[in-house]
Swiss-Prot record:
Cystine connections: none
Similarity comment text for this entry: Belongs to the disease resistance NB-LRR family.
LRR repeats: 635-657, 682-705, 706-728, 808-834, 840-862, 866-888, 889-911, 935-958, 980-1004
Classification via Pfam families: LRR_14, NB-ARC, Rx_N, WH_DRP
UniProt cross-references to InterPro entries, sorted A to Z: Disease_R_plants, LRR_dom_sf, LRR_R13L4/SHOC2-like, NB-ARC, P-loop_NTPase, RX-like_CC, Rx_N, WH-like_DNA-bd_sf
GO biological process assignments: defense response to other organism
This protein's UniProt keywords: ATP-binding, Coiled coil, Leucine-rich repeat, Nucleotide-binding, Plant defense, Repeat
Species this protein is from: Oryza sativa subsp. japonica (Rice)
Residue ranges crossing the lipid bilayer per the database entry: none
The name this protein goes by in its record: Disease resistance protein PIK6-NP
Keyword Transmembrane annotated: no
UniProt-annotated stretches for the region Structured coiled coil (CC) domain: 3-184
Function field: Probable disease resistance protein. Resistance proteins guard the plant against pathogens that contain an appropriate avirulence protein via an indirect interaction with this avirulence protein. That triggers a defense system including the hypersensitive response, which restricts the pathogen growth. At the opposite of cultivar Kusabue, the cultivar Nipponbare doesn't recognize the effector avirulence protein AVR-Pik from M.oryzae.
Gene: PIK6-NP
Amino acid sequence: MELAVGASEATMRSLLGKLGNLLAQEYSLVSGVRGDIQYINDELASMQAFLRDLSVVTEGHNHDNRRKDWMKQIRDVAYDVEDCIDDFAHRLPQDSISDAKCSFILTKMYELLTWWPRRDIASRIAELKVRAQQIADRRNRYGVNNPEHCDSSNSPRPRAHAAAQDIAEYQDTKPQIVSIKEPVGMKTVMENLEKWLTEPQPDKGRAVLSIVGFGGVGKTTIAMALYRKVSGKFDCQASVAVSQNYDEDEVLRSILNQVSKQEEAGGSTESSSRDENTREPQGSSSTSSREENTAESGTKRMLNKLKKALPLSLLGGNDDKTSVRQQETMGSLQLREELKRRLAEKRYILLIDDIWSAKTWNSIIIPFLPSENDKDSRIIVTTRFHAVGSTCSPRHKNDEATSSPGHGKDLLHKVDFLTGDKPLDLFNASIPDPMKRTDRDKKLSKICGGLPLAIVTMAGLVACNPNKANSDWSKLCESLFPYPVTTLNLDGVTRILDCCYNDLPADLKTCLLYLSIFPKGWKISRKRLARRWIAEGFATEKQGLTEEEVAEAYFNQLARRNLIRPVEHGSNGKVKAFQVHDMVLEYIMSKSIEENFITVVGGHWQMTAPSNKVRRLSLQSSGSKHGNSTKGLNLAQVRSLTVFGNLNHVPFHSFNYGIIQVLDLEGWKGLKERHVTEICQMLVLKYLSIRRTEIAKIPSKIEKLEYLETLDIRETYVEELPKSVGQLKRISSILGGNKNTRKGLRLPQEKRNKAMKNPSPQGKTKEPAEKGFLSQEKAKGTMKSLRVLSGIEIVDESAAVAASLHQLTGLRKLAIYKLKISEENDTFKELLSSIEYLGSCGLQTLAINDENSKFINSLYNMSAPPRYLVSLELSGKLKWLPEWITSITTLNKLTISITVLTTETLEILRNLPSLFSLTFAFSLSAAKQDQDTVKGILEDNKLATDGEIVIPAKEFKSLKLLRFFAPFVPKLSFPDKSAMPALEIIEMRFQEFEGLFGIEILENLREVHLKVSDGAEAITKFLVSDLKDNTEKPKVFVDGIVTA
């Protein structure tokens, strides 16, 4: 195993910055300590230089145990110094002495009051100095050689450019969209497998497709492509990853949740991601005693265990459908029973990814499948082992066994290594930018032994080294594999991943290793990751770029290198979510273990618990049997905690609240109000996510989190923030509300006494009845760092809040999920004024959901339009298109009400030079109330152009995505092939549809996706069927089904 130095060097760099800041403080240090800190600073700087030399000179060599142990000592002392400094920062009130010119007496009082903590820290620093001296002496004593003494002539590292990489090169990427991609060189195979999955079996029984092959050969890629293509033909679908170390309850619960959500959606054009009606918020009733909150009695625990063990039939649970909250408390027996009941009368398709043993199939999967199901259901299984595949598909075609009654014939498909020209074709297809094709490509694809994972990763390496000479690539091939390669084994895969990892700059190594926090197969949000990188200090201001821009550049480079796989793009063309390949995740996890960078408890792989201190903890287990899985771990130095799954217990009492900086509890159902109170004691916390938890209130003590940068409370029961949130000086992102249900988060405002609200004789109020959350004395001048304010609610009583928005001059995104104000109210005028002002300050994203539509229509003649907008969303009954939209040359994404869908509107919008996606929408909930009105408006709109909406020729030069989401979509026509020349995808969701004409002449249009909601009339179904059956190009998908 190679010596990993990426994360260690990044930690050292961050630490040196903190030491420099500490030395600059005039009043904080006890006499004599400044010299110790300076010594530690100089010693660690030399160690950092040594680390950097190691990463450049000696990577590709196996390091002896002495160097590895010495590196471990460097890392440990650096971590301990960082903890000491962070502890110092929160124990001493720096601002009170440094922000003012204090008198001699005040200075002495400060020194007296802080004498004890400063003395304690001085003692710890002295000990750390001694440790640093000992580490330096030990290196000489035991002969740890300098990097220049090591021979690097055979190093496989293509390193000419990486250390000095210009990150601005990767800051901006061209917007693009993800579509269903065929695995390279497998067109015929995919067609055959798709046909087998969709054609009925003679006895209409359940059938299993097992896809078998070596890790990295493309099993999951094939399975996912098939699943996405055919899933729309089934009543319900679910996919789950199992892997080597799985949790039975979590596997079953994941499948059940997916099936349940599809039933709840009922085929409508909009659906909620959670059941808002069946779950009660935490804290909505009277607060229980602390003893009741902190521990259950033995009797209660016994009853809960008994309930989980009993079948639902004995608990009276078969009468009605279980709620999401009930499912979260079910045991395995109840989960199996509920799944069997829900699937019994449905035609289902399941994707079970990465099964490692026949026991898993027989004991976990088979028990929940209905024994009698004649609906032609299908199961897709992926596994590395032929024996497991044969167990899952016992009646596959290579066997002489015939189908048994009630079951269809199974299929086992083996995925082999690529041969012939296929490796080179995949290599060329995996390089994002056009590059000159040379013999280099053939040589590099050949050493990958036909393994797709190795090929695409090596192609990413080439893409990021465009100026490297062919001779250097030839040397690289020879150093990696001196002998010809036919097929690649695990050691060969590791060599190639080593080569690609070693080419990364130190910052990118750290960012890549950080991904080992997430579970196998997890769909990772790009924005969530970027905010966490910033909070951890991995992405800092550099080369004139902001932290956010640097984080985006790092992400783009990892994607360009094919070390991560984008799986979902937003309508703005940027990556929304991505995944890490299983083998890449295993690789970076091994590196993280070596550096003690990430500690994972639970998850899909068995991970040896570190004997040293835990720094970043990822809890991935689920269920009560994992509740005490952190026993034996030293958690006093945990700086980052992430929870995945339904843990019953998280050991908050074991953490040092003074050093935790990242707390990501998204989706943890065990979070209680008392936990949130404890979180407010984590004084250096920078990132807090309690998204999708059952918390209903944020305590006022949140003001103590003066370093907090991100507060994510989306999809919780929190309806209003406390007034103290206005005192968070460093807050950058406040994310609240629920976009699916349009539930908004109220910003606080302070009520004034009634005497101040009495009108004057002229009928006017003497002063506002409320104060906005930024109008309080303590909050004045704060929140200047706020960049994102998303998911808020503005109503008639929010005039003070609307006025306070003026002060958020750094705001880049404002999303109002619920707006309900009357035109004569002061709130109307204040909000309009605030939006005009923020638009002039650099607002880039504006989203407004206006329930009565008066406000969005008032934007038409706005005197100072937001000229820097990149994304604009206006929801409601829009009467006319704001005339200033055409002046916004930076606009990339536009979502507007379908009520302004006219040929004239399209004529106006076609000249926007940067427009990537255009969406006409109307929410289903609003349409139910105004269905006749909306339909009448659309009928009038099309009458102006002979009964159809005509897409104008030419222009729309950048538009690649066109979407219509509404109950009624009128007739649309593309009369000229020059209309929307860059268009790649059309998406439509509707209940009533009048037709789509001329799409076959659009040269770049690849896919049309149609989703028909329940209740559609026969004429609509006929038009959809006709479009599907009579269109060869582009491909037409109806509810996910691609045309033949």
